[in-house]
């Protein structure tokens, strides 16, 4: 859900501190504004500590049932407006120097590591991209607007007197400084690779800072502003089938096709290692070039493969020292694709052990039952143990197994919410951000979340559902939901078959089942979801013998041992977990509620505040 926040028109004056009104702004996403007649207050551009501007930086798009104040503090993105002006001025100066000493055509300079601890991509800097000023005119920021408070970062639109707008992205402090630094370095390098090597339409990055030591005083990415509308506006996952059996497919494919084409281009390069992409200077320890066969001298050795920034390796790992965590995040040899699974299992087990040690000394920042942590250790060690047996990597039963195991880019957010149709470029789709993009085998890559579906498959309501015509309307709606989710995923897989058919066997049901324990671990969002990893392992146990006979797996005997007592306990715990989810309507969002809904629920007396400031749902 998108809501609008504040806009700061900034008027710089030499003789005195500048004053700037703060007000809500209608966003480029075209949704409703909070107020048509905003109240104005004023702030001095030179006063970074002016309390009048605090609301501009505070998180306002939702509230949490528990620890609301702490969660919002993590998402406060206060930065220096003066510092931002200095950074943009520096980019203009670099652009002028570049114009004076323009390199030969086709030569792309490496990233520039600047004295102010920012990194600029000088090939993206020009009067066309940054705007131009009159002689002796000083660049200044004229207006700013907070246009999106995302799940992991805040997005600001910045206008200047050079008649150009920028996007400033600031990550929330929900991870360690090291995690944010690695993530930003990798994201910018991956966007650069997508632009220069793959020819994808992405926002051009002008500059970034990997930590808060730069003039902006926050980690940031400063990039091109693209005016347009989200592809999400065209996506209706519950679109009814058209009477002609075709029109609805065209509507759905209007969204699926551009995203599938993005995916196929991302998959087109085979890398020399598994991990994530960086600029060569940001990870100089890489063994050789990121990929083979580069003929453009400007791109040779521009990038390297380093530690994976996939979210699962960094999420909720504060109990581990950085040097310990770094032992598990790669990069990994391309000859050992399943080491990614093994490392993730070992990392999660080590994290659970560290949390258990803290819990036993009453030093845990997030208390949890010790029995749950012990169960997590067992589950994740099981995942690590089975990793080398999950796939028979020499099997000819899975077509093109060699291609499925090669290192390829994996974008975790191929989603219509992450694609903008540029109104100035004939509605061309632009893939906006590349957070947590990694390099791993396609056989381990799950379908994008907007089409992913693991429930019962229904391809034809009347043929697959016995007595469908005689069901009640409520029952029909349930089956229609399953059918439409099945249909959408099938359309995505059909697009993969069209755009990159040698990888299509990765969506075969046995292959999906084999990677399911790993996928459950990757997508785990809370402590109790270790049960979903366990459930996937136990399901594999039931079919392992059949898979072994068909040479899908490399071991004849299932590698893990489960006692009847363990199986019974798992079943009981899993049922209790599902019952708790049913009772907790906001469990899927970890207790986060959109602000409008939160305020309405409080007014209606449905959410009750306790003495600790937390909220519970009135029973």
Swiss-Prot record:
The keyword Mitochondrion applies. Residues 1-34 form a transit peptide. Keywords: Mitochondrion, Transit peptide. The keyword Mitochondrion applies. One of its GO terms (cellular component) is mitochondrion. It comes from the Eukaryota. InterPro entries: Kinase-like_dom_sf, Mito_inheritance_9. It is found in: Mitochondrion. Residues 95-115 are annotated as: Disordered. Signal peptide: none annotated. Belongs to the AIM9 family. This is Altered inheritance of mitochondria protein 9, mitochondrial. It comes from Lachancea thermotolerans (strain ATCC 56472 / CBS 6340 / NRRL Y-8284).
């Amino acid at each position: 859900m998108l809501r609008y926040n504040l806009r700061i028109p900034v008027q710089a004056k030499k003789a005195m501190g500048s004053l700037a009104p703060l007000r809500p702004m209608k966003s480029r996403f075209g949704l409703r504004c909070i107020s048509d007649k905003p109240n104005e207050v004023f702030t001095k551009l030179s006063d970074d500590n002016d309390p009048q501007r605090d609301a501009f930086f505070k998180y306002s798009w939702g509230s949490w049932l528990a620890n609301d104040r702490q969660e919002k503090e993590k998402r406060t993105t206060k930065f220096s407006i003066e510092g931002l002006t200095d950074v943009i001025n520096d980019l203009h100066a670099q652009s002028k120097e570049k114009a004076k000493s323009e390199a030969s055509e086709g030569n792309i300079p490496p990233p520039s590591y600047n004295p102010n601890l920012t990194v600029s991509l000088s090939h993206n800097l020009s009067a066309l991209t940054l705007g131009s000023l009159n002689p002796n005119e000083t660049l200044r920021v004229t207006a700013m607007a907070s246009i999106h408070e995302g799940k992991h970062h805040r997005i600001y639109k910045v206008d200047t007197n050079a008649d150009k707008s920028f996007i400033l992205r600031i990550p929330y402090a929900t991870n360690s400084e090291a995690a944010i630094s690695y993530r930003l370095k990798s994201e910018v390098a991956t966007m650069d690779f997508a632009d220069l090597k793959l020819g994808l339409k992405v926002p051009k990055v002008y500059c970034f800072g990997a930590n808060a030591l730069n003039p902006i005083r926050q980690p940031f990415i400063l990039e091109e502003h693209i005016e347009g509308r989200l592809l999400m506006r065209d996506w209706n996952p519950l679109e009814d089938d058209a009477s002609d059996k075709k029109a609805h497919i065209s509507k759905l494919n209007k969204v699926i096709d551009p995203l599938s084409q993005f995916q196929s281009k991302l998959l087109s390069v085979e890398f020399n290692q598994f991990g994530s992409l960086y600029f060569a200077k940001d990870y100089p320890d890489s063994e050789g070039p990121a990929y083979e066969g580069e003929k453009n001298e400007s791109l040779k050795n521009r990038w390297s493969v380093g530690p994976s920034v996939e979210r699962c390796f960094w999420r909720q790992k504060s109990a581990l020292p950085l040097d310990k965590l770094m032992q598990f995040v790669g990069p990994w040899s391309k000859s050992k694709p399943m080491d990614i699974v093994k490392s993730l299992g070992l990392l999660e087990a080590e994290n659970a052990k560290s949390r258990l040690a803290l819990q036993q000394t009453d030093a845990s920042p997030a208390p949890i039952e010790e029995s749950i942590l012990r169960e997590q250790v067992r589950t994740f060690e099981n995942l690590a143990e089975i990793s080398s047996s999950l796939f028979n990597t020499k099997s000819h039963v899975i077509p093109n197994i060699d291609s499925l195991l090669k290192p390829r880019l994996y974008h975790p957010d191929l989603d219509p919410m992450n694609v903008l149709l540029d109104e100035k470029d004939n509605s061309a789709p632009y893939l906006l951000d590349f957070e947590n993009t990694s390099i791993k085998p396609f056989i381990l890559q799950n379908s994008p979340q907007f089409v992913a579906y693991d429930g019962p498959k229904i391809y034809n309501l009347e043929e697959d559902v016995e007595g469908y015509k005689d069901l009640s309307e409520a029952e029909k709606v349930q089956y229609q939901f399953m059918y439409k989710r099945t249909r959408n995923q099938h359309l995505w897989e059909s697009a993969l078959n069209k755009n990159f058919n040698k990888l299509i066997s990765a969506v075969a049901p046995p292959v999906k089942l084999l990677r399911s324990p790993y996928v459950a671990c990757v997508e785990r969002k809370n402590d109790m979801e270790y049960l979903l990893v366990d459930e996937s392992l136990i399901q594999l146990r039931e079919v392992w013998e059949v898979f072994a006979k068909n040479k899908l797996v490399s071991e004849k005997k299932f590698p893990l041992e489960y006692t009847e007592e363990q199986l019974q306990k798992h079943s009981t715990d899993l049922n209790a977990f599902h019952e708790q989810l049913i009772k907790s309507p906001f469990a899927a969002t970890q207790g986060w509620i959109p602000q409008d809904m939160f305020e309405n629920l409080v007014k209606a007396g449905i959410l009750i505040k306790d003495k600790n400031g937390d909220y519970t749902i009135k029973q």
